Swiss-Prot record:
One of its GO terms (molecular function) is DNA-binding transcription factor activity, RNA polymerase II-specific. This is Spalt-like protein sem-4. Residues 6-32, 487-530, 542-562, 725-744 are annotated as: Disordered. Keywords: Metal-binding, Nucleus, Repeat, Transcription, Transcription regulation, Zinc, Zinc-finger. Belongs to the sal C2H2-type zinc-finger protein family. Transcription factor, involved in positive and negative modulation of transcription. Binds to multiple DNA sequence motifs in the regulatory elements of target genes, including homeobox selector egl-5 and LIM homeobox mec-3. Involved in cell-fate regulation in multiple lineages, including neuronal, mesodermal and vulval. Required to regulate the fate of PLM touch receptor neurons, acting via negative modulation of transcription of egl-5 and mec-3. May modulate gene expression by interacting with different transcription factors during neuronal and mesodermal cell development. It comes from the Eukaryota. Residues 513-525, 728-744 have a biased composition (Low complexity). One of its GO terms (cellular component) is nucleus. GO terms for biological process: mesodermal cell differentiation; muscle cell differentiation; myoblast fate specification; negative regulation of transcription by RNA polymerase II; neuroblast differentiation; positive regulation of gene expression; positive regulation of transcription by RNA polymerase II; regulation of transcription by RNA polymerase II. Residues 13-22 have a biased composition (Basic residues). It is found in: Nucleus.
Amino acid sequence: MNELLAEMAAVSSRRKQSKPRRMSGEGDAMMSPIDLSTKSFDENNCEKGAGGALPLEDRSNILPHFSVPFANPQQFLSLCAQLGNSSSRNVSSTASTTSSCPIQSCSQSFSSPAALTWHVLDAHEDEQEIFSCDVCTTTFSNGQDIREHKCQKTLASRSTSVPPSTIPSSVCFLSTPTTPCLQFSINESIGTSEIREEDEEEDMDVEDGEHVANQLFGHLLQKSDDKSKMASLFNHAFPPFAAFPNMPPPFLMRQPFDPRADVFAAGRHDNDDDWEALMEISTSDEAEKIRALVGDKAVPTTDPNQCILCRRVLSCKSALQMHYRTHTGERPFKCKICQRAFTTKGNLKTHMGVHRSKHSFRGLPISLPPQLAAMHQHQHQIAPPQRIHIHNPPTSAASAAAAVAQIQASQQCPICQQRFLNAGELAVHITEHRNSLTQPPRVMPTPTTTRVQTFPFVPFFTTPPSLNATDMSTQFNLANILSAQLKNDSSPNTDTSSVEEKITRDDPPKMASLSPSNSSDSSSSVRQDILESSEFEEKLKKLEEPPILEQQVSTTPNPKNENPLLAMQKMWAETEPPPPRQMPVLSKHQCGVCFKHFSSSSALQIHMRTHTGDKPFKCDMCGRAFTTRGNLKVHMGTHSWQQSPSRRGRRIFDVASSVTEKPMLQSPILPTSGAPGASPLAMLGPNGLSGLEMMMMLWRTVCSVCQKVCQSPNELEQHLKEHLNNGSSAAPTPLASAATPPPS
């Protein structure tokens, strides 16, 4: 220690400006000393000395350590120490040997390197290449470049497997990685301050002015950003605890990112009725369509919200954009469920209410007692949806018609208009629709059930009232109940089976199978699918053939062998009326016939006219009727005889009254003289026609040459041909002679 002090005293010409730093042993392993040596690092001196301390370099210039907020303060202080080095020629420093300003135009000298550094940073801020790095010999012009400097050589050396204890602190601090060096912390500053106090007790010759300069230097360094200071404190104030050597650094204690969070976030929806996925928004260029309609000769508008096509002034820019869609026909908002398009998103959201409501299903089948209805409902709730099968094929034309009617009574999905055989399949299909609404946009799910496409859809009534047919599954249930009651009967099995066979052939749509053997073995027997076209056609061919067994049984009737079940069925059908049909619960704007949903009551009212056949708007010209007034207006355009600008914009219902009030002025075919004469309107007679219809008849039947009133358009055509053949000097008709005033 004394030898090192002697060397330092020989080098320093003025006074001792710094003192060597003592390295801590194993007990102070957590406090790394700050070495401000200006000499390049000698790898031969990296070996540990006695006592576990590293030997110091022979020349050093150490300043009191201040807790500064720079990203790498040791590098900045090391460059400041180069300015105070006086006689060493081996250091790469551009500072003068007498602590004078290195700038040639400035002749000031300072008592300490801290004061010199203050002067250089304050007065010569714009000078080039004042400071340099000891490791990579990079030059700097200001302190900001020094703080942002990252030495690449030391970064490469730190990637090796050299233990941190064998690397001097100067190299560690000169290297500026992305994150500041871990050895710099508040504990180190506290430890170095204690060492400085011990050195100051040993070296009492340090002047008080140097402490003042150091305080000013520390105040200068404290002018950096508060954010970097707080980041430095949080990143380096707490070193790893000695009792847990395997603990990672503090910045690695952060909770790792869990990729499963995005998976759950993607599948989570705040609202089950999120219909945005079912809305398709087109991004076509509407301005290009408007330019195509306007053309090259566009007249400039006088208002920013004026339509360039029809010169209509709108209230705002958005209203103008909506108005342009009436010209271009653009409908950018489309429903993915029914493929309908709308001009505004609000209209599309209103339309989505048609699909938003929970769809009601059909009630229970007709003509079922309460016990069987409850059993039927319980079976449909438990049993999975299955296709309808029959055990015994029908054997008559009436039974074939009943089977066809049963197939025609299919269920239809109100969303995608798919048809199904029973309400169970429809319920499963609509449940898939509801489940798909909360998922990302994908292809609409297709059910695995069989779709009915070959038969038309019967909207409400499942079967015609004349056939008295019930559901096939209900027939099987009724057959099982009645056959169970037959087990207690004492009648012979042979007679019962023969009569049951007759009953089966006589009335198959009412009773599919009545024998106990057939009812018990119906589940194990092979059932033929009626949806297969080839087999179904064969069954229909067999139905047309007269059954032989039926003729044999009918030729030899036996009243004693009459089945009591048939009598019970006839009694039930004749005496007890069928219970009323259970109507489903409808939504606010849902049709009770086809169960379609509508957005408003007016739309539902117009739709109901398609079921009732009501057409309240009738054309007075041709007698055609329409369900809406708009359709009638479009139809009246076919009867218009002129499209003059004076008539445009007028209501079609006001034309008749105006024509009736001023017939002489509106009709160009009538004589203009004021002489009394019979007008064509008067010649038509009071036939109860309206004024508009009378004008149309005049236009079609009155000659424009001689004003003759013909009885039909064909007669008028023949009359005009006569004018063409005979010339324009044809004799005037009695109408023209009567209308012409006599000469005075």
